[in-house]
From Swiss-Prot:
It holds the Pfam family RbsD_FucU. It is an enzyme of class 5 (isomerase). The keyword Isomerase applies. Catalyzes the interconversion of beta-pyran and beta-furan forms of D-ribose. It comes from Bacillus velezensis (strain DSM 23117 / BGSC 10A6 / LMG 26770 / FZB42) (Bacillus amyloliquefaciens subsp. plantarum). It comes from the Bacteria. Homodecamer. It is found in: Cytoplasm. This is D-ribose pyranase. Pathway: Carbohydrate metabolism; D-ribose degradation; D-ribose 5-phosphate from beta-D-ribopyranose: step 1/2. GO terms for cellular component: cytosol.
């Protein structure tokens, strides 16, 4: 049995398989997952697990080069927008329209669905390298 780090075997495998510039999406409960995109559904009930918790844990297990979010989060969900800005202050943060964001999830190696029930609480983490 694994003792440390990411215990969810599906997420651990995706993280281990990431290469430079690969994408992994962390989504609220309402984000549509494109057909064919691998979905890891962690949602248990409204708000559990939270977007911030899942994002922090996943990001802590990988080299993050860039974070992508919908520009709408800034006005519709300032608390989670502030979280993204502060948690990823050392990384590039790119904003795009929610429609563009949804299209980009088609390229994600996985979409991790949380129980988050606040608007636009989604981000895409682009893998960096550790050397």
């Amino acid at each position: 049995m694994k003792k440390h780090g990411m215990l969810n075997s599906h997420i651990a495998k995706v993280l281990a398989d990431l290469g430079h510039t690969d994408l992994i999406a962390i989504a609220d409960a309402g984000l549509p997952v494109p057909d064919g995109a691998p979905k890891i559904d962690l949602s248990l009930t409204a708000g559990v697990p939270a977007f911030r918790d899942v994002t922090s844990l996943v990001a802590g297990e990988m080299a993050v080069e860039k974070v992508i979010a919908a520009s709408e989060i800034k006005d519709a969900n300032p608390e989670n927008a502030s979280f993204i800005e502060s948690h990823f202050s050392a990384q590039t943060i790119e904003y795009m329209s929610h429609e563009e964001f949804k299209r980009l999830t088609q390229k994600a190696k996985a979409v991790i669905r949380t129980g988050e029930m606040t608007p636009y609480a989604n981000c895409i983490l682009q893998a960096g390298v550790i050397f």
